[in-house]
Each structure stands twice: as structure tokens, then as C-alpha cells.
Amino acid sequence: MPLRLLLLLLWLWGLQWAETDSEGQTTTGELYQRWEHYGQECQKMLETTEPPSGLACNGSFDMYACWNYTAANTTARVSCPWYLPWFRQVSAGFVFRQCGSDGQWGSWRDHTQCENPEKNGAFQDQTLILERLQIMYTVGYSLSLTTLLLALLILSLFRRLHCTRNYIHMNLFTSFMLRAAAILTRDQLLPPLGPYTGDQAPTPWNQALAACRTAQIMTQYCVGANYTWLLVEGVYLHHLLVIVGRSEKGHFRCYLLLGWGAPALFVIPWVIVRYLRENTQCWERNEVKAIWWIIRTPILITILINFLIFIRILGILVSKLRTRQMRCPDYRLRLARSTLTLVPLLGVHEVVFAPVTEEQVEGSLRFAKLAFEIFLSSFQGFLVSVLYCFINKEVQSEIRQGWRHRRLRLSLQEQRPRPHQELAPRAVPLSSACREAAVGNALPSGMLHVPGDEVLESYC
């Protein structure tokens, strides 16, 4: 659920504190139903109303009040919305909005006559918490976007790092970048929710509805692609460790098809059903839960599969580290480090709250779930880029070698040697930088290489 929508729900929830009728306090569900019913009545009214013949502003429900068609260069006035719990206290009040001379709604809106006479401190505090969470995930996605772009450039520029494993990493980095960019773009296009006063009223977004829905579709695809590439990482690592004796180089096209093609299999049906059955606003509200499960179900399946792969890999890690316990007495520390390293790569943290829906949690648990998911999702790309690029030993070795080669070339240019005496830096074999897993490799000691050890070293 987008954070701006949650801000609206929190606002509606906060309204119930303001008034208690003879039958008791209004529940959150009843309040939301009244607000939803108000919006539906507005849509029906607009459908049955003939637009004026001259230049006029379009009728719309701006998530607060219902506005009829209004002649250009006039100020529209409507009664305070009846869904407000304190409506009896402000029933004589009005909301005002300016229709410009060009037939477009202006940014000015005044509903001071409809404001709650009694401000609620608890609601304001929780609204502040959600606004800070939005700032946090904006910082997280921005940081992830920057570090992922740098990591992608590093893996692309150093040719000796080109192998199937790093190709998959690069596609995963790209999916994280697209997810971050799509979410940040969607936030800018989503309709501002909640009440505003005077000059704080936001610019109407009806004209950008198509762009907003397009951004919503792209966001769902990018999020789905991110989960499928996390699944590709898990499947690839599992194949390297379990299905020994078979090369993975020829499977990369299948991984590409799975990573970028699978999300379209559930996003396209969701778009069609959403357009036919729930074509409202910017598609940010999921009122018909069956439609939302078209997207949610495949994502939950990928999370579950990756969690099972994670458990399987942990079993392999434990068995291999125990066999080398005499040589590696700190195997428990290495196991803990490997476990923590694989968590962001496979998205294992998602399994904590994945089975819990928005309707199943309330109060503090809902905020805890939201904060947990927002923090880890926004900073996950940053963690993956750091763990699998910036502090990766192979990447660091290539950067050092590239720096030494550059210094050597500069030194040779300064010495100005004769053409037949010019020296070239010695190339490093491909296998020394990016090694694919091989079965039966001989170690310097003459012992046979244990299948999977090199893979675990590369990942963990």
C-alpha cells in the first residue's frame, strides 16, 4: 500500500477521535466506508450531470470534497463533506475552490470552515511518524539508486569480471534501480491526500491521471522484476551447489527470460482486470482484494521459494564448514557471516511479514510492520551493492590491478622509451578474476577441490 494512501487512512482513523455519538465512538471501518460512499455518490452525480456548453472546469472528487462542473473564472462552493464525524458542528460551512479562466482548477482551495474544531494530538503525532517514514524510504531508495549505478558501472567496465554470476548480479542491480526510480516517480505523481488549507492546497492531478496510472503499472512491473531476479539469484546459487557437473553458462538466457519476462505474466492480467473492474483514481487503492492478489500471490511464491532455497543453502554451509572445522575453528563465525550476507541477496527478510496483510494488523504492530518493510526494502539495494561489489575481494583486486596498470602506463609514458623497447603490462588471465564454479579442480596441495567451496567463497 502506498504510504500516501496510508496517510489518508490514518487521517480518517484520526477523525474518529473527534466525536462520540449516542451509540458510541465511530469505528475506523465505518468511517472509511462513509468516506468511500461519499466518493461513489460523487461519481454517480457527475455521470448523470450534463457538462455546461461553455468553458468549464471538470467535475471531480479530490479525495476530500465533491466538485461539480464549474464555469471558468468563478469560485466554486460546496457544503462540508457529510462523512466528517464533526459534520453536525460544521454543517453550515463550505469548501471553496477556484476555477481559472482557462477552464482548469487552480491550486487554491479553502476548507477552513470544515476543519475539526478539536485538534487531536495523537493523530498529529502518528501523521508525523508516517511523514518521517516517507522521508526515510526516499533517502533509502535515493542512496540505493546511487550506489547501484556505481556498482553496475564497475562490473561493466572490468571485462575480467564478466561471467554468469556477475551478469546475474548486474541484472539484479538493474532491477533494484528500476524499482527505486519507479517508486520515487510514482510518489511524485500520486494524488496528494488529506486536508489542506489556503495556499497549501496541492495542484489538481486529474490532468496527470494517465501518467500516474502508467507510473503505477511500471512500479508494479519493476517491483515484480526485482522479486524474480532475487529468485534467479537463489536458483542459480542452488544449482551451483547442488546440481554439480553441469555448466550454468548456457542457462543465462533462461534466467533473463525468467527475470524480465515472468513479471509480465501477472502484471498484464492485473492491468486488464483493474481497468475493467476497478478503474478508479490512480489505481493506488486496492479495494477489491481479489484483484490485488493477482500480483501479491506470485510475489509471495517467489519469497517462499527463496526462503526454502536459503534453508537448503544453510544446510550445505553447515555441512561443509563442519568438515573443515579442524582447519577453520571459527566456522560458527563464518556461518553467521555467510548467513547475513545471503539474507539481502535472496530477500529472506521478506518472509517475516509476508503472510501478514494490511487488514490483519492494527495499531503499533501495523506501524512496526510498515517501518520494517520500508526500511529494508529501500536500503536493500544499497546493502546488495556493498556486499557483492564494493567489498567483494574479486572486485577490489580488479580495481587495484587496474590502478596499478594505469600508474605503470603513466610511468612508461614519462620515461618515453623507444618503440621497440616499450613495455606493456602483463595481462591477468580471465580465470583469476571471475571464476565459474568447476567440479574436480585440483588444489595446489594435490587434493581434489570440494564441489561448492569456490562458490561459497565467491558469495559468502
Curated annotation (Swiss-Prot):
Belongs to the G-protein coupled receptor 2 family. The chain crosses the membrane at residues 135-155, 167-185, 223-243, 256-276, 298-318, 338-358, 371-391. InterPro entries: GPCR_2, GPCR_2-like_7TM, GPCR_2_extracell_dom_sf, GPCR_2_extracellular_dom, GPCR_2_GIP_rcpt, GPCR_2_secretin-like, GPCR_2_secretin-like_CS. It is found in: Cell membrane. Residues 19-134, 186-222, 277-297, 359-370 are extracellular. It comes from Mus musculus (Mouse). GO terms for molecular function: gastric inhibitory peptide receptor activity; glucagon family peptide binding; signaling receptor activity. Coiled coil: none annotated. Gene3D superfamilies: GPCR, family 2, extracellular hormone receptor domain, Rhodopsin 7-helix transmembrane proteins. GO terms for cellular component: plasma membrane. Keywords: Cell membrane, Disulfide bond, G-protein coupled receptor, Glycoprotein, Membrane, Receptor, Signal, Transducer, Transmembrane, Transmembrane helix. This is Gastric inhibitory polypeptide receptor. SMART domains: HormR. Pfam families: 7tm_2, HRM. May form homodimers and heterodimers with GLP1R. Residues 156-166, 244-255, 319-337, 392-460 are cytoplasmic. Disulfide bonds join 42-66, 57-99, 80-114. N-glycosylation is required for cell surface expression and lengthens receptor half-life by preventing degradation in the ER. Glycans are attached at residues 58, 68, 73. One of its GO terms (biological process) is response to calcium ion. This is a receptor for GIP. The activity of this receptor is mediated by G proteins which activate adenylyl cyclase. Residues 1-18 form the signal peptide. It is a multi-pass membrane protein.
